[in-house]
A protein has these predicted regions:
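Leucine-rich solenoid repeat scaffolds
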Residues: 2-14, 20, 128-158
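Conserved long hydrophobic alpha-helices within structured protein cores
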Residues: 34-38, 71-102
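Ankyrin repeat domain, specifically the short helix-to-loop turn at the C-terminus of the second helix
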Residues: 18-24, 42-50, 75-83, 114-124, ...
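Ankyrin-repeat boundary/"N-cap" motif
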Residues: 1-6, 23-30, 52-64, 87-104, ...
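Ligand-binding grooves and catalytic loops that recognize ribose/phosphate and carbohydrate rings
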Residues: 55, 60-63, 69-76, 80
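Hydrophobic repeat-domain scaffold segments
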Residues: 23, 30, 36-42
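Ankyrin-repeat intra-repeat helix-capping/turn positions
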Residues: 11, 35, 69, 105-106, ...
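Conserved ankyrin/ankyrin-like repeat signature
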Residues: 15, 39, 72-73, 110-114, ...
């Protein structure tokens, strides 16, 4: 995993800013996680299969874009063939894009839009992540009744 993603995962904003100030050439995972759509588009133009790659830590670009709240990056990945129901390959977490969207940090409106986008692209509202945790469980854990209602309307089991 890159230093940049490690800093992002750790919430170390100063380190993230320091690393980004050096204007690094972002890989597909970093571009997705930071919502750098121009770089993401460039990487996908070079090799469309990157939309479905997995990072060393097991996450995929779509899950990163969703978790970190980048709707345009998520839409770009979906439009370029990212598998909306692909589970990350980490041993314990195994999340899909819909799980990441429903659990995303940030405001409810952003989570709602990301969940809606994933569902519009065929996300399974009942797909369990590792341990059986479902997207609706994430919405309930966040107290996000709007996302919970959307999931129920799209077939999530209560």
């Amino acid at each position: 995993m890159s230093d940049l993603l490690q800093a992002l995962y750790a919430g170390d904003r100063d380190r993230v800013d320091e690393l980004l100030a050096a204007d690094p050439e972002l890989d597909v995972f970093e571009a997705a996680a930071f919502g750098r759509d121009d770089r993401l588009r460039e990487l996908l133009d070079e090799d469309p299969s990157r939309a479905n790659e997995f990072a060393d830590d097991g996450f995929h670009p779509l899950g990163l874009a969703c978790f970190f709240g980048h709707r345009d990056a998520a839409r770009l990945l979906l439009d370029r063939g990212a598998d909306v129901n692909a589970l990350s390959t980490n041993e314990h977490v195994q999340t899909a894009a819909l799980h990441a969207a429903a659990a995303a940090a940030g405001d409810e409106a952003m989570r709602y839009e990301l969940v809606k986008l994933a569902l519009e692209h065929g996300a399974d509202p009942n797909l369990p992540q590792g341990g059986g945790f479902r997207p609706i469980d994430a919405a309930r854990q966040n107290g996000d009744s709007r996302v919970e209602q959307l999931l129920l309307e799209r077939g999530a089991e209560g």
